[in-house]
Structures are given as C-alpha cells and as structure tokens.
A protein has these predicted regions:
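Surface-exposed alpha-helical interface segments used for non-catalytic interactions
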Residues: 44, 57, 61-64, 84, ...
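Short coil/turn linkers that connect adjacent helices within long alpha-helical scaffolds
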Residues: 14-20, 33, 53-55, 73-77, ...
C-alpha cells in the first residue's frame, strides 16, 4: 500500500502542471494504497476528462469505480453529496450512450432523485427532473413527461435563470407536440427561442437531452407546420434549423439536428436534401458512437437513396436502421421510420415486405402516437 501511495505522489509531482492525463492512474494507485477519498476525487476528475472528450464508455467505467468506493464510506451527509455529484455525471454518460432509452438511464436518474431528496438544497434537482421527463418522453408517456416539464418550469421561474428557462420550455414542447397540442408546443418553442443564446446555451445539451434546444425548437416547428398542412412554413423553419446546425460545435448536437432534418425532408419529399443531412448525421454518429441518431440517419439515408434510384443500397441501409431501432426499443418516430422503410421496399420491388412494414408502423402509431 505504501508503494502505491508513493507512486501516486510521484505522479502528482511529475504532472503537477496538468494532472488530467494521469488522473485515472493516480486514482488507481490511491485505491490500491487504501486512500479511498483521494481515489474517489481522482476517479471523478478522470471521468470529467472523459466526458469532455465524449468518451462515454470510459467515463462510465471510471464513475462506477468511484461509486463503488463511495459505498464503502461511513454514512454521512458528505458521502451522500459526493455520491450525488458522481451520480449526476453517470446520468449524463448513460443518457448519451442510450439516448434516454436504456434501463440504466432511468435507474441513474431515479437514484439521483433519491439522493436529491436526502439533501436539503441541491442545484441538481432541476437536472434530475429534466432527465426523468426525457425518459418518460422516449417511452411515450407524454402526460408524465409534460408534468415533469412543468415542475422544471416552476424551478426555473423561481430561480430566474435564463438557461434553465430555455431548458424548461424545451422539456415542455416535445410532449405537447406528440399529444397534438400544437398551440402549447408553439408557445413553449417561442419562449425558448426568445431566451436562447448559442454561446451561452449550446453546452447545456450535455445535461439536457444530448441535443441543442434551439435546433430542436426549429425542427419541431417545421414538424408542427407540416402536421397542420402549412408546407411552405415547414420548409422555412427547417431551413432555419439547417442553417443553425452549421453553427453548432458539439458533435451530438450536429448529429441530432441533421438526423431530424433527414426525417423532415422525407416528409417534404426531398430525397436530395434528405441524403445530405442524413449522411452528415451518420458520419458523426458512427465516429462518436451515437446509436439513436445513427439509426435515424440510416433509415433516412436509405429512403433517400432508394428514392433516387439506388434501391438495393437504400433498402439495405433502411433495414439496418430499422432493425437497430427495434433492438434499441425506440418508440418515438417509429411509425415514420416504418413508412420510409416500406417505401424503400416498394421501390426495390418487395411489395409483400413493404405491406408488412407499413402495417407494423400503423400499429406502432396506434399504440404510441409516435
């Protein structure tokens, strides 16, 4: 143990100017040296480095190590607060890895809420409620989602924080859209857009949805206009979203906005632009390991290729994306993904498969209003 403590000390001295690259090594040596609290602090630091690099799998492993050590500490308020800080980072990492669809994500946010309730005052309650709203939204429990969104809005209004207000409105417009309550959705989108500042608020996406609030408001505005038959306005709002996307700096935000643009260009019957945006979404998603935007982009890209004559390649891509979506437990937009795959199958000369896929999409919409 003494040797490990000495190695940790030597690393701290040698890399004093920048401890980030060796923080995981120091944590490991401190753990083996019996310095539990020091090891926890360095595992936390190493996880923050991994999160900044979008290395979510590495962050998860480091956070699990830290949490295992926290659970060996004597019960105290300080231990609860330390666990909560780690749990919040675990929520961020799981949300990115599973796009709020995995059971791990729901467990992480549920545990974080339990910890928040054990601490008298915490700035994390808003973030936890927001995460639980997103979990509810992705499982298509729209009423629960909107109720949690309004809890977020009450906290944001009490604090008067512009960034939290942006994200509270962001939480509300999604479930209202899927419930078909378009006036409420528009009201929250307008309020969020009025407050949004890219330099200040894009980075919030790491904790709030793994996508940019402004891009979401713009492309969902396009969806509302399309849903209500105002196709010209749908084009205008989608073009605003695409222009905004080119200014974004975080890869997850770019992948999300481009993937949704691909879906909406399908609705607008524009396979050329669907191909361009879906291809960008796929490129970023594959490079960074984003499953949700990867399968959205795959189906949209497949449809766009089939619609332009590359039917074999297109239907193969669309099938791959649909299979990944179903394996992942995706519900939102499942019926549109089915429509794109069905059309690609029809164009490729597979009418029986097309009919089967289309019937599955109709059943999905009947169940989830997705």
């Amino acid at each position: 143990k003494l040797l490990h403590r000495r190695v940790a000390g030597a690393l701290e001295h040698a890399f004093a100017a920048d401890l980030d690259p060796v923080s995981a090594q120091i944590a490991s040596h401190l753990q083996l040296g019996g310095e539990t609290r020091g090891a926890i602090a360095y595992y936390q630091r190493a996880s923050e480095v991994a999160l900044r690099l979008f290395a979510y799998d590495a962050a998860l492993a480091l956070l699990e190590q830290a949490l295992t050590l926290v659970h060996t500490l004597p019960a105290s308020t300080a231990a609860i607060e330390t666990e909560l800080e780690l749990q919040m980072r675990l929520c961020t990492a799981w949300a990115a890895v599973t796009s709020y669809l995995g059971k791990e994500t729901e467990r992480a946010y549920t545990r974080a809420l339990e910890l928040c309730q054990q601490v008298q005052q915490t700035p994390h309650l808003f973030t936890v409620l927001w995460g639980l709203h997103e979990v509810a939204l992705y499982r298509t429990d729209y009423r629960a989602s909107v109720e949690l969104a309004h809890q977020c809005l009450a906290i944001a209004e009490e604090l008067g924080d512009p960034g939290l207000l942006v994200e509270a409105h962001h939480a509300a417009w999604g479930p209202y859209y899927f419930m078909g309550e378009y006036d409420h959705a528009f009201a929250h989108m307008r309020a969020g857009l009025d407050l949004y500042n890219r330099q200040q608020h894009e980075a919030l996406s790491a904790d709030f949805g793994v996508h940019d609030a402004c891009a979401c408001a713009l492309y969902e505005s396009a969806l509302v206009h399309w849903s209500t038959g105002r196709l010209d306005q749908a084009v205008v709002w989608l073009e605003r979203s695409v222009a905004h996307t080119r200014k974004l700096t975080m890869p997850a935000n770019v992948a999300d906005a481009d993937a949704y643009a691909g879906l909406i260009y399908h609705l607008l019957r524009d396979p050329v632009r669907a191909q361009a945006t879906a291809d960008r979404a796929m490129t970023v998603s594959i490079e960074k390991g984003y499953p949700y935007t990867r399968f959205l982009g795959s189906v949209a890209l497949g449809w766009s290729l089939a619609a332009q004559g590359s039917t074999a390649e297109g239907v193969a891509l669309a099938r791959q994306g649909m299979a990944a979506s179903e394996e992942f437990g995706q519900r939102l937009h499942h019926s549109q993904l089915a429509a794109m795959l069905a059309e690609a199958c029809l164009l490729a000369g597979h009418p029986v498969e097309a009919l089967d896929v289309a019937e599955g999409g109709l059943a999905s919409f009947a169940l989830y209003r997705d």
